[in-house]
Amino acid sequence: PQRRERNFYSSTVGPNKDRTVVIISDAFLFEAAKELQQRLDKRDVFGTEMQYAVTGLPSVTYFGMPSLLPNHELAYQGNKELLVDGQKAINLEQRMHILQTIEPQSQAMRLTDFLSLSSTEQKKYVVDQKVIYFYHNTVDATGDKPASEVNVFRAVEDAIAELERGVDRLRIISIRNIYVTADHGFIYRRHLLDSTDKINLPSDVDFEQKNLRYAIGSTDFDEIGVDNVKLGDILGNDDQRFVFYPSNANVFSVP
């Protein structure tokens, strides 16, 4: 596909000559983005356009967040760590360093921290900056925990309201180019999983990572209901490991 997540910066952010703001909302669904767009379109001051991008696999935060940064080379080190041009991209400071390596006039901040600033402080923060990344985590912080996942739809509604407010504030301080995107979405099922919903992975295959929706390993195998793709094809390198994933609505059986 032409619109790959890992090409986001080079195809969307980099070519802009004007100041550009990117808001990355963790696990913000495509459908939720449509709702946000509809709300913004009701205002005469906003002109919106929605496009898609194809996420890599596994479609999880530790792959998606680094992929949205400027990159020439992405490399999976194992242990849930994806390097960007040989650098870690786990926390805010590391991501800002990567941004500033490509564009020195770059900043990164949590959206909630930005919204807590006064209007004067917000203007001061963005002045002289070319690229600004804001990180937003309302949906994933709720939906990725068993104790709170039942509240994920309320979290989506809260996220839409927070993003709407964020766009409002940015427009007030004369930011014109604003991109709202996500590292991945989510799949939600109301009923409890039983044995018929689960796929047993081969016991004689070693996996570096094994999750409900994906597994990473070096040995290919044939199993009904399981597809795979080479990690190198996802990252654009020569990594020969495989990402395995259910080809239907089922999940992998994990401890």
What residue spans do the PLM features occupy?
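Feature captures the catalytic ectodomains and active-site-proximal regions of enzymes
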Residues: 1-255
